[in-house]
């Protein structure tokens, strides 16, 4: 099974190289966003959302972990985040994504992976599944392809609609000063020392 999962991840790397992060047109991005709204994801944040954000993430990604930490402050004031799991960083990224998706309480599993993240090893905190369900692997594959079709070379990658309904997309960890504009919410004070260099 480990060999199979490794082959899946290798396929993601090869696919990424082939796509070479082409930038879609505004019209194509609208169509991609419609697909994104239906993508398999872990929903976290406000029940009565004032703003909705979609984030592609790899469970082993350091900058995804930092993005999660930053967005917690905005979730407290009305942000809802759809965390869309992909797998490309490590052979066990598929297993970690599956561990979150197949958990009874997905949001709790996502939080555990983030809180227990090991920055020294670039590893998520959740134990990867050795035998993910085939349908789970297919969903993670589909998410990864969708992210690449948006033009993102890696994670994190954020997608959202502004108040006028225009689709926006950003690859990489946003600066803290950008988060108010991205979420459409008042700027939040973030004192996390690990995020200080991203102001």
Predicted regions and their residues:
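Thiol/selenol-based redox catalytic cores and closely related redox-interacting motifs
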Residues: 89-179
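Extracytoplasmic thiol/disulfide redox context detector
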Residues: 2-5, 10-90, 131-154, 172-199
């Amino acid at each position: 099974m480990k060999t199979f999962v490794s082959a899946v991840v290798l396929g993601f790397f090869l696919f990424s190289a082939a796509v070479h992060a082409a930038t879609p047109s505004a019209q194509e991005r609208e169509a991609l966003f419609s697909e994104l709204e239906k993508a398999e994801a872990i929903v976290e944040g406000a029940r009565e959302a004032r703003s909705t954000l979609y984030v592609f993430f790899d469970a082993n990604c350091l900058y995804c972990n930092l993005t999660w930490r930053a967005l917690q402050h905005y979730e407290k004031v009305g942000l809802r985040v759809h965390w869309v799991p992909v797998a490309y960083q490590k052979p066990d990224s598929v297993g970690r994504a599956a561990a979150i998706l197949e958990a009874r309480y997905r949001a709790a599993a996502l939080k555990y992976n983030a809180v227990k993240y090991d920055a020294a090893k670039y590893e998520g905190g959740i134990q990867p599944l050795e035998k993910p369900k085939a349908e789970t692997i297919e969903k993670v594959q589909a998410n990864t392809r969708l992210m690449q079709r948006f033009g993102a070379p890696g994670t994190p990658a954020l997608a959202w609609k502004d108040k006028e309904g225009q689709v926006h997309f950003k690859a990489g960890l946003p600066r803290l000063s950008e988060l108010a504009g991205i979420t459409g919410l008042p700027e939040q004070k973030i004192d996390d020392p690990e995020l200080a260099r991203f102001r």
